[in-house]
């Protein structure tokens, strides 16, 4: 599936547009009724030997996604359905900010590399917190419907990466 989507669509787009399109596809697949179930069924590893206990959490596997992909806490459930046991959202700053001017992400094909100079573009801490509150409320409604590590509607653990708002002077970073 990745080869098809990547070769046919994403590779032909500028890097930042490919990132946005890929994330949109993941979110849509996770929002369609039955979508998360299908994603987990087709793509997520389910071998019990992969289960991990870390930081007091029972996780369905050892693989997580670091900050930078889901900057605004919009797709943790969909990313969990792909098989990530934990997702770090952000980097989130206290205030919304646009990030660096474009182009700010580009490919270096000869080096098989991607350069990211995004600059913490995000909708701000209040927006991310509201999305996470809504996610938690949805999880609470589904509590008790499935048991055990990595089970239930949205089994992915979520962390938040925080950063300094660009407009804030360095000596005020802690207060920010």
What are the residue ranges of the model-derived segments?
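An N-cap/entry alpha-helix motif that binds or orients negatively charged groups
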Residues: 1-52, 116-121, 125-126
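Conserved, mostly hydrophobic/aromatic
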Residues: 14, 65, 87, 128
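Conserved alpha/beta-domain cores
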Residues: 59, 67-69, 80, 91, ...
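Flexible glycine-/small-residue-enriched beta->alpha junction loops
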Residues: 92-124, 135
């Amino acid at each position: 599936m990745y080869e098809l989507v990547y070769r046919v669509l994403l590779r032909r787009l500028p890097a930042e547009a490919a990132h946005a399109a890929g994330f949109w596809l993941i979110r849509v697949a996770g929002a369609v009724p039955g979508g998360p179930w299908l994603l987990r069924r087709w793509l997520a590893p389910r071998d019990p030997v992969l289960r991990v206990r870390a930081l007091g959490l029972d996780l369905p596997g050892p693989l997580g996604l670091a900050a930078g992909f889901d900057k605004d806490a919009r797709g943790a459930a969909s990313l969990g359905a792909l098989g990530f046991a934990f997702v770090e959202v952000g980097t989130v700053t206290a205030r919304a900010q646009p990030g660096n001017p474009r182009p700010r992400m580009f490919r270096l094909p000869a080096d098989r590399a991607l350069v990211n100079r995004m600059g913490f573009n995000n909708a701000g801490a209040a927006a991310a917190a509201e999305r996470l509150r809504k996610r938690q409320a949805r999880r609470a409604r589904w509590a008790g419907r499935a048991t055990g590590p990595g089970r239930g509607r949205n089994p992915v653990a979520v962390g938040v990466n925080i950063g300094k708002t660009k407009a804030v002077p360095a000596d005020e970073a802690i207060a920010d």
